[in-house]
Regions:
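A short, structured loop/turn motif at beta-sheet edges
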Residues: 89, 121-127
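Secretory/export targeting leaders with adjacent low-complexity proregions
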Residues: 129-149, 155-157
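C-terminal, well-structured catalytic/ligand-binding subdomain of enzymes
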Residues: 29-79, 84-85, 95-122, 145, ...
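Sec/Tat-exported extracytoplasmic proteins
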Residues: 35, 124-125, 137-138
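Sec/Tat signal peptide C-region and signal peptidase I cleavage site
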Residues: 21-27
Length: 419
C-alpha cells in the first residue's frame, strides 16, 4: 500500500469539511508542524503519551554519535526503550503504536518501536539520516508505528513504518500537508485494512484544534501544551466540560468521561519539541515535558545540549514531578470502583483552592515559559556553555516543582499515588 490510499482518504476528509490533514496511531495523540505553520517559524511536534504504566521519567543517555534526553518508563533502569526524545544535534523523535501496521499472522506487533527510537537518537542528526536508517534496518525490527521526527535543519516528517516497509509524509510537501501540519492518533493511512486502528474521535478533535490555531498565528508551544494536550472535549457528544456551567449541588459534581478525550485517564506524560531557529543554532532545540497526566502536571524545558536532565524530571526510581502529578491525578479521579476510574471530577479541576487544579498548574507553567523565552533570546545572541544551560533548566524545574508542592500541599499530604 502506498500514498494512493492516503490521497483517497485525504479527498474524503476534505469533502467532509476538514481543512487539515491527519494520520494516526495507538492511544497516544500526536501533532507535527513545519516552520511555515508555527508562530515562531520553527518546526514543532508533540505527543500525549498513553500507556498502562503511570511512572515516567527522563534519562540522559549516550549514543555512538549523539547524546540525548529521553522519556522512559521509570522501571526501565537502563533506558532500553525510549518513548520520545531529542539529541544534542537537535534531532527529535516520537511515535505512536499503529496496530494496523502489524502482522498478527507473523506475530509482529511493534515490540521493537521503543528500542528503535533509542537507536535513532544515538545515530541520527537529521531527518535524512533517519530515513537512511529506516532503509538500512528494513526487515530487521518488529515495527508497527508512526514515527514523527524533526531536526535542526527545519525538517518535519512522519514515517508510517512496519517491519518491511515505510512511507514518508513530509510536512513541507503541499500534497501531503497543504497547511504544513499533520496529526495522528491510532491508525495509519497506509494500513491494508481501513477498518482497523482507533482514536478516530481524537484524530478529528486534534485536527480541528490545530486547524483553528494555525491561521490565527497561535500554533506554538503554549497553545499545544495548554490547550491541545489538556483538552477534555468530546465533539461526538458535544461535550466540553471546561466551558459548561459547574454543578449547583456540591454533592453532585460535574464529571467527564476521559477515555475518548485528548487528555485521557491513561495519559501519563506529554512531550513537545521545538526545532532550532536556524541550522547553526541546534543547541537552542528545546524539549518540553509534562510528567504525569497533562491536567495534573506542569511542563518544564529541557535542552539536550546541556548534557543532562533536571533532577525533578528523573531519579533512581521515579521522578519527583511525576510522583506529584500522580497524587494530583488521584485527587481528580476519586472513584476507583470498576470503570469509574475513567471519570474526572471537573469541579475539582476548576474550583480546588478557589481557582481550580488546572489554573494552578497553568500559573506554574506560565512562569517556566516566561523564564525560558527570556533565556533563549539571550542564548540566541551568545551561545551558552553546557553547564550554563544545565544550571538554568535545573533552576526552572526546581522552581516549578516547589511551586506545585506548595499549591497542592493538601493533596500531596493525604494522597498516595497509585503504582
Amino acid at each position: 500500500m502506498t500514498l494512493k490510499r492516503f490521497f483517497i482518504l485525504k479527498a474524503i476528509l476534505t469533502a467532509a469539511g476538514a481543512a487539515w490533514l491527519v494520520q494516526a496511531a495507538a492511544p497516544c495523540t500526536l501533532a507535527l508542524a513545519s516552520g511555515r505553520a508555527t508562530a515562531n517559524g520553527r518546526p514543532m511536534m508533540w505527543k500525549n503519551r498513553d500507556t498502562s504504566d503511570p511512572n515516567n521519567k527522563l534519562m540522559f543517555l549516550k549514543g555512538p554519535k549523539n547524546d540525548f534526553a529521553a522519556l522512559v518508563i521509570s522501571e526501565d533502569a537502563a533506558g532500553t526503550e525510549v518513548w520520545g526524545g531529542m539529541n544534542a544535534a537537535g534531532f527529535a523523535i516520537m511515535n505512536s503504536q499503529a496496530d494496523d501496521l502489524g502482522d498478527a499472522a507473523r506475530k509482529l506487533d511493534g515490540s521493537g518501536n521503543g528500542a528503535f527510537m533509542k537507536l535513532a537518537l544515538g545515530e541520527c542528526a537529521t531527518v535524512r539520516e533517519f530515513e537512511a536508517l529506516l532503509v538500512r534496518e528494513k526487515g530487521r525490527w518488529d515495527l508497527a508505528t508512526n514515527f514523527g521526527v524533526i531536526d535542526a535543519e527545519g525538517g518535519a516528517c512522519f514515517f508510517e513504518t512496519r517491519r518491511d516497509s515505510f512511507v514518508k509524509f513530509d510536512a513541507a510537501d503541499p500534497r501531503v500537508a497543504p497547511f504544513g501540519t499533520i496529526v495522528r492518533t491510532n491508525f495509519a493511512f497506509t494500513s491494508p485494512d481501513p477498518m482497523r486502528g482507533g482514536g478516530f474521535d481524537r484524530f478529528e478533535r486534534i485536527g480541528r484544534l490545530v486547524d483553528a490555531a494555525r491561521p490565527l498565528g497561535r500554533l506554538d508551544a503554549r497553545f499545544i501544551l495548554q490547550t491541545a494536550a489538556r483538552d477534555l472535549a468530546n465533539d461526538k457528544i458535544h461535550s466540553d466540560p471546561l466551558a459548561r456551567p459547574l454543578a449547583v449541588d456540591p454533592a453532585a459534581p460535574l464529571y467527564v468521561h476521559t477515555s475518548d478525550t485528548i487528555n485521557r485517564n491513561s495519559s501519563v506524560s506529554a512531550i513537545l519539541f521545538e526545532g532550532a531557529p536556524s541550522r547553526g543554532q541546534g543547541y537552542l532545540s528545546t524539549m518540553w515535558v509534562i510528567l504525569g497526566q497533562p491536567v495534573a502536571g506542569a511542563a518544564v524545558p529541557v535542552w539536550p545540549a546541556a548534557g543532562k536532565v533536571p533532577a525533578p524530571t528523573t531519579g533512581p526510581q521515579t521522578a519527583p514531578l511525576n510522583d506529584l502529578a500522580l497524587a494530583v491525578a488521584a485527587y481528580l479521579y476519586p472513584d476507583q470502583r470498576g470503570r469509574m476510574y475513567q471519570y474526572l471530577n471537573v469541579d475539582r479541576l476548576r474550583t480546588y483552592g478557589g481557582e481550580g487544579v488546572l489554573a494552578k498548574v497553568l500559573r506554574v507553567e506560565d512562569r517556566a515559559m516566561e523564564r525560558a523565552a527570556a533565556k533563549r533570546t539571550e542564548w540566541a545572541a551568545k551561545k551558552p556553555s553546557p553547564a550554563e544551560m544545565a544550571d538554568f533548566q535545573e533552576s526552572v524545574a526546581i522552581e516549578a516543582y516547589e511551586a506545585l508542592k506548595k499549591e497542592f500541599a493538601e493533596i500531596v499530604g493525604r494522597a498516595v499515588p497509585a503504582r
